[in-house]
Amino acid sequence: MGSFSIWHWLIVLVIVMLVFGTKKLGNMGSDVGKAVKGFKDGMKGGEDDKPAAQNAAPSQVADKGTVDVEVKEKSNS
């Protein structure tokens, strides 16, 4: 009584197909597939960015003992 048989699921599937139509269900399926692929690519790309960020940080740090100044000419006014 608590479990659904295959016939219950087939009836639910037929009702869903009648309500939404097969074209709409196909579009929703492809949209979900594209979203999952985009998510996986995003997660994969996020892991690749971490080593590049770690390598770039030390090269940006300047020697703390040096000071960059700009020389301006002194005017005699």
Swiss-Prot record:
Family matches, as InterPro entries: TatA/B/E (IPR003369), TatA/E (IPR006312)
Q: What kind of membrane protein is this, topologically?
A: Single-pass membrane protein
Q: Does the keyword Cell membrane apply?
A: yes
Membrane-crossing residues? 1-21
Q: How does it assemble?
A: The Tat system comprises two distinct complexes: a TatABC complex, containing multiple copies of TatA, TatB and TatC subunits, and a separate TatA complex, containing only TatA subunits. Substrates initially bind to the TatABC complex, which probably triggers association of the separate TatA complex to form the active translocon.
The record's function comment reads: Part of the twin-arginine translocation (Tat) system that transports large folded proteins containing a characteristic twin-arginine motif in their signal peptide across membranes. TatA could form the protein-conducting channel of the Tat system.
Q: What is this protein called?
A: Sec-independent protein translocase protein TatA
Q: What is the lineage of its organism?
A: Bacteria, Pseudomonadati, Pseudomonadota, Betaproteobacteria, Burkholderiales
